[in-house]
Amino acid sequence: MRARLISYNGTTMYDLLKTIDDPADLRRLDRRQLQPLADELRAFVLDSVSKTGGHLSSNLGTVELTIALHYVFNTPNDRIVWDVGHQTYPHKILTGRRDQMHSLRQYDGISGFPRRSESEYDTFGTAHSSTSISAALGMAIGSQLNGDDRFSIAVIGDGAMTAGMAFEAMNNAGVSEDAKLLVILNDNDMSISPPVGALNRHLARLMSGRFYAAARAGVERVLSVAPPVLELARKLEEHAKGMVVPATLFEEFGFNYIGPIDGHDLDSLIPTLQNIRELRGPQFLHVVTKKGQGYKLAEADPVLYHGPGKFNPAEGIKPSPTPAKKTYTQVFGEWLCDEAERDSRVVGITPAMREGSGMVEFEKRFKDRYYDVGIAEQHAVTFAGGLATEGLKPVVAIYSTFLQRAYDQLIHDVALQNLPVVFAIDRAGLVGADGATHAGAYDLAFMRCIPNMTIMAASDENECRQMLHTALQQPNPTAVRYPRGAGTGVATVKEFTEIPLGKGEVRRRTSQPEGKRVAILAFGTMVAPSLAAGEELDATVANMRFVKPIDAALVRELAETHDYLVTVEEGCVMGGAGSACVEALMESGVIRPVIQLGLPDQFIDHGDPAKLLAQCGLDGAGIAKSIRERFLSPAADVADQAKRVA
């Protein structure tokens, strides 16, 4: 039973799928019903994602594997950890969330990733990659210690095997001889950017070797001659590779390697998993799937259909009209190419995010200076440090949330040695549909405490370009943060201008009398809503530009000429940019009431970014409301007068 192409007409009835409310219902089906169910499930995934947006290619590729796992194993007693977690839509549909898929990645809807608080079947949250083997091993050992008899299964794919953490876990797991642990490599040759490196080439050689293919075919012919042996041959299908290629990379880690097998063939998947279920010790199953499986358009262009917005499945994704505003990612990509044209020492580095970070054009034009290191953020940062020691100008393009994974390297390998590495930090602040796991809420706080760091936050497209240029001129590690999505509509200037180090600018001055003068000290994306609040309240607004070094002179000047100060940032308040202003204020000896506005001390869920910012009080109306209630209301006047008398 193998996957078939979807004939999408929008009228699929889902007769079988409607009967599945949990995996127990699935396990009651006859084996012959599973492929029709897979066809319905694949069509349902396509129909759902086309209406909400989300990850499509990888989910179309996990349909049969998901069905087989829940059919063979006793979930949720047996644990499944999905890695990367965006390949779990079929899993969510089969585990009681079919009728919630219309809310996928929407405000107050279900998450696009596994979430423990959402379902008992979501055993571990996995939105960042390469964590599944560690988590599943912990579950397997924990079950042993608790005396529980259950399997722990890590499904790892989408480039996640390129990360060192996966191999650290395998190294540990390989000596756990009694652990009921299964690692499934979902080999679909698909990370967000194509997988890279020696490991990927090794896997490709294993799968495409003519000797293995010919030998396997010969073994199967021999075994199938005698009918009594035929069933044995089928049961031992997963061991065929071991008969001709005995020592694999994974066996060296202490795993029993099985495969590769067709991840879209239920007649191969189910008996293989049933056999594995009877084994003890760490098992490694190599499953080959196809991204976009069953939907011709996604099969032809899996990158385009990796994470689409809403579209008509019958027509496919249509080219969007050129937007009026550039995205910050586009601004970065254009800047990097311009700098590389001017200076042959400029080198671009990405940890498997070529498209997402805007480096497609750079790779085309400067291939010898482009390095995609795979999902290896720690290596990316230290690699950049090494390049810097040789007089090159490395630029690390990285999402804020993924820079967290390389914090020690940022401190020990780059900042401690004061190496001139530029960090272009994309997706800073809230990121919308991807939610808390991908929010760039912490970069200002965790970088600000590191000696030798310079940190800038861009308020518009041209400022982003000029900040990146300024960063490239610095003799020390420098970060420029900018948000996901479109800018404010400001045109970028081709000519480069270096921004004075540690200097902000006043964008608006108040005309209020003494006692009513408010100064808003805004950072990055919060400059625009702060200007809106400033217009409403007639407040001074400063674009602070630098988080480190903070413009202490401007902080003091605003404190001396205003009655109240407000700091606004799209990041966590604790330890962030506002804290830098308060520290500078304390150093100045000028005492003024201060409000620090930013992201609250909680994880912000997925949803429309504008709605989420408003919920956090970080739109123009919310900023004005906070200022009015704290400083400008009659009650605030009474409280202020009482403090002055005291």
From Swiss-Prot:
Question: One GO molecular function term?
Answer: 1-deoxy-D-xylulose-5-phosphate synthase activity
Please report which protein family the annotation says this sequence is part of: Belongs to the transketolase family. DXPS subfamily.
Q: Which UniProt keywords apply?
A: Isoprene biosynthesis, Magnesium, Metal-binding, Thiamine biosynthesis, Thiamine pyrophosphate, Transferase
Transmembrane keyword on record: no
Q: Which organism is it from?
A: Burkholderia ambifaria (strain ATCC BAA-244 / DSM 16087 / CCUG 44356 / LMG 19182 / AMMD)
**The protein's name in its UniProt record:** 1-deoxy-D-xylulose-5-phosphate synthase
Q: Which residue stretches, if any, does this entry annotate as coiled coil?
A: none
Binding partners and assembly = Homodimer.
Q: Which pathway does this polypeptide act in?
A: Metabolic intermediate biosynthesis; 1-deoxy-D-xylulose 5-phosphate biosynthesis; 1-deoxy-D-xylulose 5-phosphate from D-glyceraldehyde 3-phosphate and pyruvate: step 1/1
Q: What does the record give as cofactor?
A: Mg(2+); thiamine diphosphate
Which Gene Ontology cellular component annotation is one that this UniProt entry carries? Answer: cytosol
What GO terms in the biological process aspect are recorded for it?
A: 1-deoxy-D-xylulose 5-phosphate biosynthetic process; isopentenyl diphosphate biosynthetic process, methylerythritol 4-phosphate pathway; terpenoid biosynthetic process; thiamine biosynthetic process
Where does the chain bind Mg(2+)? D158, N188
Q: Record keywords: Magnesium included?
A: yes
- EC assignment: 2.2.1.7
Q: InterPro entries this protein is in?
A: Dxylulose-5-P_synthase, THDP-binding, Transketo_C/PFOR_II, Transketolase-like_Pyr-bd, Transketolase_BS, Transketolase_C, Transketolase_CS
Under the heading CDD domains, the entry gives: TPP_DXS, TPP_PYR_DXS_TK_like
Which residues participate in thiamine diphosphate binding? H86, A127, H128, S129, G159, A160, N188, Y295, E377
| Cofactor binding note from Swiss-Prot or TrEMBL | Binds 1 Mg(2+) ion per subunit.
Superkingdom of source: Bacteria
Catalytic activity from the UniProt record:
D-glyceraldehyde 3-phosphate + pyruvate + H(+) = 1-deoxy-D-xylulose 5-phosphate + CO2
Q: Which SUPFAM superfamilies match?
A: Thiamin diphosphate-binding fold (THDP-binding), TK C-terminal domain-like
PANTHER family attached to this UniProt entry? 1-D-DEOXYXYLULOSE 5-PHOSPHATE SYNTHASE-RELATED (PTHR43322), 1-DEOXY-D-XYLULOSE-5-PHOSPHATE SYNTHASE, CHLOROPLASTIC (PTHR43322:SF5)
